[in-house]
């Protein structure tokens, strides 16, 4: 947790009920299962906020509707909404989402992480930073930042 909270009293929302995957149309074990919006949301919903003991879903930083998937073109976009427009943790949140998806999805997927329009004071700079491969790689070479990201990611079951 970070001292000197940016948002001392965030609104905590009820969690959405988890839906079970029921698609049994693919019976061939060699055929890859399509990836959909719900699967992506399930990967990121339990990421912890770097500042609070709550998940990104609890704080509505991410919602199922904030996920777009084009499985045919191997493209995923997650648009997240920081709890305050001057959130200093927005870069860390975006990096957590990216790392979780990089670890969870096949490497063929292009992952696009965005801040919701109008939700952050430095929206354009954040979007550029979160989608610049060299900046992301440099960030992931920083052991302190990697430790912070790993602390936010849910443990694998």
Swiss-Prot record:
The cross-references to InterPro entries, in alphabetical order and at most eight, read: FSCA_dom_sf, MIP18, MIP18-like
Which tissue types show expression of this protein?
Expressed in the embryo, shoot apical meristem, leaf primordia, inflorescence and all floral organs.
DNA-binding among keywords: no
Keywords from UniProt, A to Z, are: Chromosome partition, Cytoplasm, Nucleus
| Phenotype when changing residue 51 to K | In ae7-1; leaf adaxial-abaxial polarity defects, highly accumulated DNA damage and activation of the DNA damage response
One Pfam family from the UniProt entry?
Answer: FeS_assembly_P
Q: Which GO terms describe its cellular component?
A: cytoplasm; nucleus
One of its GO biological process terms is: regulation of cell population proliferation
Q: What does this gene product do? A: Central member of the cytosolic iron-sulfur (Fe-S) protein assembly (CIA) pathway. Involved in leaf polarity formation. Promotes leaf adaxial identity. May play a role in the cell cycle progression and is required for cell proliferation.
Stated family = Belongs to the MIP18 family.
| Protein's UniProt name | Protein AE7
Organism of provenance: Arabidopsis thaliana
Gene it is expressed from: AE7
């Amino acid at each position: 947790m970070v001292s000197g909270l940016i948002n001392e009293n965030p609104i905590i929302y009820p969690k959405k009920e988890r839906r079970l995957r029921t698609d049994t149309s693919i019976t061939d074990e060699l055929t890859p299962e399509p990836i959909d919006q719900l699967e992506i949301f399930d990967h990121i919903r339990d990421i912890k906020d770097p500042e609070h003991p709550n998940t990104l879903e609890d704080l509505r930083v991410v919602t199922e509707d904030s996920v777009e998937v084009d499985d045919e073109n191997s493209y995923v976009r997650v648009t997240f909404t920081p709890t305050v427009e001057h959130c200093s943790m927005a870069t860390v949140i975006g990096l957590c989402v990216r790392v979780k998806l990089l670890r969870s999805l096949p490497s063929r997927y292009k992952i696009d992480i965005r801040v919701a329009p109008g939700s952050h004071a430095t929206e354009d700079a954040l979007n550029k930073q979160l989608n610049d491969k060299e900046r992301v790689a440099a960030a992931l070479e920083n052991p302190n930042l990697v430790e912070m990201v790993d602390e936010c990611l849910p443990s694998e079951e």
